[in-house]
Amino acid sequence: YVKHPAAMRWTHIALPATNIDKTIDWYTRFTPLELLDRREDTDGQGAWLGHPDQGDKPFVLVLVSFTKDQDKGQQPIMAPFAHIGIEVTSKEEVDEIARRGDAEGCLAWPPTLMPPPIGYICALKDPDGNMIEFSYDQGVYAKAQEVWG
């Protein structure tokens, strides 16, 4: 590769996916992530999902479906508390995500107002049972802007 980061960077989280097509579809419907790359070889399939506006500082979700693990079924890594967090723009957006998740049978935590700094949250389970938290007013974005500009 010709391009490399100027300094050490946090670049990805990797999760196993039992059915990579179903999992890519789930993440592109329920989160702001978009498919960046997809590969397949004899060892299995892989996909990178991320935010298209992060070209200069990418952070991606890596989904991997190893051929040798296909008969093992779901392998949730992020459960019951470990989770990926996504900050949304409004309380109503949390409610809408929870409504959609409930309709599809993947709502894990209903919308709940938690004490600071947690904020208003809900969580869904992805097709492999991993927890994805959606929060409003959690403050991660605000704190990063305050401290790092």
Label each region the model flagged.
Residues 1-2, 68-74:
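Short beta-strand/turn micro-motifs at beta-sheet edges
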Residues 1-6, 9-19, 47-52, 72-149:
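Vicinal oxygen chelate
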Residues 64-70, 137-138:
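Acetyl-CoA-dependent GNAT
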Residues 24-25, 95, 132-133:
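Alpha-helical elements of the RecA-like P-loop NTPase motor core of helicases
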Residues 5, 41, 55, 76-78, ...:
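A generic structural micro-feature
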Residues 7, 15-61, 65:
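Core segments of cupin and vicinal oxygen chelate
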